[in-house]
Amino acid sequence: MESEFSQSLTPPVSPSALNHYGESAPSRPPCFTCAYEAGREDTGRLSSNGYISRGALKRLLLKLDPAPADFGGDTVDIFDFPWVTETALVESTKLLFGLFRQKVLKLETLVQSSSHDFGQASSLHYEAEELRQQCVLFLSYIKVFIYRFLEPSQSLDEGPVHPFKDAEAQLPSVLVEELFSITLLIGRIGNLPANVQSAFTIQHQGKLFPPSWQLLHLHLDIHWSVLEILHLLEQRMMGQVVYAHQFVNLTGETLTNISLFEDQVNNLFCDLIGLAMNKYNKVRPTETLNTHHYHCLCTKELWILLIHLLEHRSKSIHTQSFWSYINALLQTVLKGTTSGDRDPGFPVHCKDPEGFTWWLLTHLAQIGMHNRNGTAQQEKQLEDNWSFVIGLLKSICDPKKAAQEEQIRVVVHCCLSLSLMWGPNVSAVTTFWEYYSKNLNSSFTVPWLGVSGLGSICRTPLCLLQQAKSCCSPAPVGSSSHTQLYRTANSFHIFLRILALHLSQEHAGGAPWRQIKGRLYSKFHQRRMMELSDMGLLHFLLLFLVLAQCAELEDVASRACDLLAMLPTNSTPLALRALQWRGQLALVLLYLEKGLDVGALAEQLAVYFSQAAREFYLKTTEPSRKLALWAPLSSYLEGVSEVFETSPNLTLSEERLLNEGFGLLLPACRQSELSSALGFLQTVLAQLRRVHQRCGQPSHSVDSPSWAPLPSVAKERHQAVAAALWSHFFPFLCSMRLSQTPPPQLADAAAGFTLLALDMPGSAPQNLQPHPIQSIMQSFGWDEMLHPLLVTHYLNHLLQNGELVSWVSSGQGSGSAQALCVRAWIRCVLQQYLHKSPDAPDARAGRNLDEQLAELTRQVFRLPEVEFVLQRAGLQSAAVKDPKAAMAVFLKAVGRSYCELQLLSERSSAVSRALEYVGDILKYIKPYLQNKSREGLQLAYWTIGCLVKHWSHLLATSKAQQLLFRIVDVLLLPHALLQQDTAAHTQMLSALKDSLPMFLQGLSVAVSVSHSQGAYLKQQQHSVISQYLSRFLPATPSTGAVVNHPVLLAACESTPSPQGERLRKSILHVLRENFLQFKGLAPPPRLAAVLCFLLELLKRNSDRDPALLTIPLPSVLRCLMLVNEPQVKRLSSEVTQLIVERCTAAVGEQPCEHTTAILRAFVDENEGVYDQQVYNVLEVVAVLHPFTVAALIPFLTLSLRKTECKRGLGKNTSLRNGYRRLLALLGDSGQAEMISLEED
């Protein structure tokens, strides 16, 4: 070492000469750096100051000047001294290298002496950076000097030789010796102290780095620069071997530039692999492709540099390729021993040598995808290494090894990555297939992964096909989907991706398929098929679906079906049969995608389904067996549903999947199973209609696939599908329509058939012709025996369809369709309480019915006919949402619109239409009258009450009278209700009490307008009033009971009207004839209550007609005369007072003739019997209105004298005294009559 520094350190050029020569100030040479750059960490972009980004690699490989912009001056500043550019390396080789070693040692000393004092961080950083830059600059100068100034050695002629020439000739050998000494000085990366190696993990967010970071990256710079220099030297020497003479002479070893390059490459790879091995020991299998093998981007860049340099040398001078070096070292790792005597320099005991090898190979292949600019490319930049990989693969797949799934999954994952980067390899595919063909029944799960690692059983054919398709389109290597495959897919699924890659090679002309077709098919035969478990069968299906997608579809599908047919029908577990059907239906879906006819596949599958359905239908089949059979049957339903939903045109024999098996399956289904089956039917019906409608659109031909048939042919195929549906499904729906527990899907399915008949009327069976829509709606919407839930759901589905509403309004054969829809709505509203129960399931059904009724109400009010009726009546329906209130609005609208009609013909038509709306309405409510449901009776009586009130004019016509008579007989005057001792009709009376006012008001109007049956109606009206006046009248006067009496409420009105007056007149007649008649001297029962009722009736109405008011007056006067009970006396007096006042007010000051006539009759009737009582009664009247009694004075005086004459006893003093008291109340007329009496 001392000899190197024995020469003078005086620079060869004096400072005074600098200006003359023109000193060169070279720019900073490229170097390895991890300094932070925005966006670099996220994208993995290499440093902008590195060898690749600065173009050093490209210039090296293209034999260009390593630094064309640098070292152009006569002198160069190296290690703080100026040197002559063209001669410095020749003249001062050992001096320069000595200075270089001095700087390296100084940096090492700085690392050892550095502390964690932040105050010194800045100074240490800049000092270490300066030392490193000086070393890198020197190495860059060596490269430039070799490229520009070094001449190949030539044979020297005998004679004296200039010392410079001699030194120049020896320079290559000296360079090799010095480079070797540098490698000895810095040693191996793996041997660096731990504190230096830890710089790999420094977070590079700041701008200040410790000396250890600078030293570590200087080592990387030196290792790479040595290789660059040796490569440049070899180029300049034109392939001549350069020997290091000093080492040959001293040690006897042969050191050349070639051997030094090889040793340096091997040592560098050993160090890099050792670093990667240390990192791999912390990598979980799930992170295999997520975790890179390099510690930082500098080592990544070093890998890229080595790959391109070695591949370039391999192609240009036929040296070892990159993979040759790596394979030899990895073999050492796998064997665990060193190859030969050379120490590879990395730990030979790895926790998982094979896993590490696969991991490193995969990531090196990824690194190999980078071009000379450091950019990742789609095409491979590095030749593949399949020969080595296949050897590894055969080793891991050896049955003797019994590798676990977690190991196999890593291997397959890595192989997939390699296939994506290098292109598939048939040997890899066949090797894997040999392994998987023996292990198809395995679940390929990794226990410690939990649920995320379990293989998923595809529940539907479409799901199965999608899983297979996902294997046919593997994600790019760097994507998240690809890196997460270890978690999301098992090893078999990953193998299928490799297989698909192999089969999908472009420009291969089918060769990949021919290469492996025999190998794949030969593994399956009847015994092997019978050995398959459910997991094995799933893997079989996925395999063949991938083959069908990527190879010859028809050939693969035929082979798969033949193999599946080998499974015995009787002994195959039903779960396997379900999976088998899903697989075959997935093939059908694939056929549809390709536009191929599915007839053959569908026929075979439909036969299997029909056999299973027949067994399901038989009553001899055990319940447990039926339950198990439902698994494949439901799979078939789901799969066929997906077939129809997927098919773009339904022209590829899809109807073959719909056979007589459905006719056996549907009747045998339980409730939940039937829901699934009917849901399937809805899907098929909807898809058929959708496709058929699209087929008729002009734009259809533009959007259709190239294989789509002509519209006429398509419509024929649609007729075939429709025929299968009508034949195998519709009869069952008809058999279920009268069920008292209809499934919700029944209505939807029936509606689907109705709309199908609308779109394709010719497809309907003969028994529904010539008007199929009307026939179906009669069966499922208008029949009075149908459950309301079915009707509401069915009509809601239909009336939302604009085309069907148009047909209902004016379509051919529609007839009274709108009226029938209204009638069905009214019936459903009326019968809603027949099917409601407090039990939980029924309660849910009740809520469902309420929702459906509300929706049906909205739809019915949108019918054109209903809208017209409401508009003509001037009623708004927008705010009416409650079905009960909406029904009242509709009935009111019908009645009002009838009253506005003038022409007799219009009125006659309106009556007929109105009767169509309600139908046999009494039949709808009959169940309530039998089971005495409180809510039902309330609704029934309230509805019919509205009907009678608002349709009174209409019901009085000859066409509708019978309905009115039946209403009175059934609801108001039923025979059972007339039996006073019956206690079972409390609920009925309660309901009637609330609605009776509407009945009485409507009857009153009907009586007044009826021409043919007015007398009979009037008699019925009196009977109703009499019956319920008595029923609801309390025994003793009770203000609440009397005030809320339904008959009283019916008669009261704020504004007098002729209809109200007629009703009150009828009530007064009933009161007089039935409730105020004395039997001899005995007063009528409940007299006080009756008088209280009469008083309220008169008070709450402002009638002024004396003829009406005086109807009860004779009876009231009699009560006043004969009954001494104080309450009766008071009430009678109040009634009399009210009548007399009203009558007097009506006629003015003159006596009322009606009142006078009644009083005269009263006196005449009771003279000679109740004379004194008569005068007492008249006194009451006289107090109220003396003029009325004064007009009777002549008649009273005559009556008195007649009475005395009859008795023959002369003057009756007591009688005359009573008369005088009366006369005293009558003013002047009374006084004059008293004088006249005195004169008698």
Swiss-Prot record:
Protein family (similarity comment): Belongs to the MMS22 family. MMS22L subfamily.
The protein's UniProt keywords, in alphabetical order, are:
Chromatin regulator, Chromosome, DNA damage, DNA repair, DNA-binding, Nucleus
Lineage, please?
Eukaryota, Metazoa, Chordata, Craniata, Vertebrata
Instruction: Extract the GO molecular function terms from the UniProt entry.
Output: single-stranded DNA binding
Outline what the protein does. Answer: Component of the MMS22L-TONSL complex, a complex that promotes homologous recombination-mediated repair of double-strand breaks (DSBs) at stalled or collapsed replication forks. The MMS22L-TONSL complex is required to maintain genome integrity during DNA replication. It mediates the assembly of RAD51 filaments on single-stranded DNA (ssDNA): the MMS22L-TONSL complex is recruited to DSBs following histone replacement by histone chaperones and eviction of the replication protein A complex (RPA/RP-A) from DSBs.
Q: What is its main location?
A: nucleus
Per the UniProt record, the source organism is: Danio rerio
Q: What is this protein called?
A: Protein MMS22-like
Q: Where is the composition biased (Polar residues)?
A: 1-11
Region annotated Disordered sits at 1-26
Compartments where found: Nucleus; Chromosome
